[in-house]
């Protein structure tokens, strides 16, 4: 199964994944499970009060899981400079500092700057709010004109990779070709034999 293949690829390798909603009990439970099984090194974002409050209310033990408070990040000035540079005149320092109060922007910059390997969000944030920072700060992979997404659908023994159900609203013919190629590439990376329909 796709999930098993992904787990094998990252397990025990110290892959750091940022969870933008560290105050959500579902996120905390997932982070605990991933850490206990040495799948990834989860990083919970949020204030100490938010994270501890959620853990206490839900009888969860998040001790030993890295937590980063965007309000007290020691490399914030470096992050602000980098984000101003990436936004190239679209956001000044003041606007960047405001944006970085959002854990979606903050988490995306942690990935962009190499402090984390990936990001998971969307438990409480909308898809648009989760994806927008990545579109603005990470950009498309080299050789690609656009960014697309894919969903993994698993039901019993059936596995499907559905291409771009949420990013490109009205793709033209060329876009559809690129989305198809990107989705097929993602499927192969997951160890799935591709049949494009």
Indicate residue ranges for each PLM-predicted region.
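Anion-binding alpha/beta catalytic cores of soluble intermediary-metabolism enzymes, centered on
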Residues: 1-197
